[in-house]
């Protein structure tokens, strides 16, 4: 079989270049990988892990007057982005399209129309049917819902709009699931499961029998929800309830939940590792989607 080769790729809101990880794992070759990102810690991590990523800065600067920062419109094979989701999500203070952060979606749409990539992927959270309908009309495709639980022990439902054919949510093959546990210390689990109190079921844990974590988001990494309540996903009673011990997942454990290589984010502070991972793709989900690109050579 011929290996898939792409000309140029543009990753908007690139974060820590999770898309680049997926391309590498799939053995997809490319000539240029352009990344638009403004968060310094994310850029630092991307550069530490990959020296072939071309960082082109703010999405607002990728314009015709700036010659699209070197991107040739007729040579772009893949456009990928997941703009900040809080403005769309019903958990995002009901701001929806009025949220300034949602304006980044329209930058994605602008570049989709101006650069005319062969393939595109747009990712976002589950949201109200009305907003889904509006986005679908703008992008010209219906979304596919994929839960990261297909590939790692967390519940992280996301919508993916793409023109890549034959992408669907499906049952994973055995080798899709990471073989090793996400946990550095398994000793916490049995005691935690035994001593969970009634009414505390929202503090889900990944246990050896396959139960799953709730979705990982940045607010959960901070340990609080948007309204100030304790976060669900990363504040876990991995110790003894009787003494009130609460431990967060380690950055390494979070990397494994997001199917990012071990220690990929070790070049920044623990807080910034949590933030970067919480805002990033689950890499194996992106692998699943990219794996459907037809090889037309």
Please identify what each model-predicted range represents.
Residues 1-297:
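Conserved active-site and SAM-binding loop architecture
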């Amino acid at each position: 079989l011929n290996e898939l080769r792409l000309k140029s790729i543009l990753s908007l809101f690139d974060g820590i270049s999770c898309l680049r990880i997926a391309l590498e794992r799939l053995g997809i070759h490319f000539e240029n990988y352009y990344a638009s990102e403004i968060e310094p810690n994310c850029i630092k991590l991307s550069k530490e892990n990959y020296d072939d990523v071309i960082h082109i800065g703010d999405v607002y600067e990728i314009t015709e007057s700036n010659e699209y920062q070197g991107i040739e419109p007729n040579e772009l094979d893949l456009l990928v982005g997941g703009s900040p989701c809080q403005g769309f999500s019903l958990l995002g203070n009901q701001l929806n399209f009025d949220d300034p952060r949602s304006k980044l979606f329209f930058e994605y749409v602008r570049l989709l129309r101006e650069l005319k990539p062969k393939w595109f992927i747009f990712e976002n959270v589950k949201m109200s049917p009305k907003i889904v309908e509006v986005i679908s009309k703008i992008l010209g495709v219906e979304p596919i819902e994929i839960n990261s639980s297909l590939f790692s022990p967390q519940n992280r439902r996301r919508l993916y709009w793409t023109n890549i054919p034959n992408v669907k949510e499906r049952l994973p093959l055995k080798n899709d699931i990471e073989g090793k546990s996400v946990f550095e210390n398994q000793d916490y689990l049995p005691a935690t499961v035994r001593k969970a109190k009634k009414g505390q079921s929202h503090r889900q844990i990944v246990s050896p029998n396959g139960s799953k974590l709730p979705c990982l988001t940045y607010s959960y990494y901070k340990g609080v929800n948007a309204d100030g309540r304790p976060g669900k996903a990363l504040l876990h009673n991995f110790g003894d309830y009787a003494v009130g011990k609460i431990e967060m997942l380690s950055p390494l454990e979070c990397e494994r939940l997001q199917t990012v290589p071990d220690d990929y984010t070790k070049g920044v502070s623990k807080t910034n590792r949590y933030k970067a991972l919480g805002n990033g793709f689950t890499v194996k989900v992106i692998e699943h989607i990219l794996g459907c690109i037809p090889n037309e050579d």
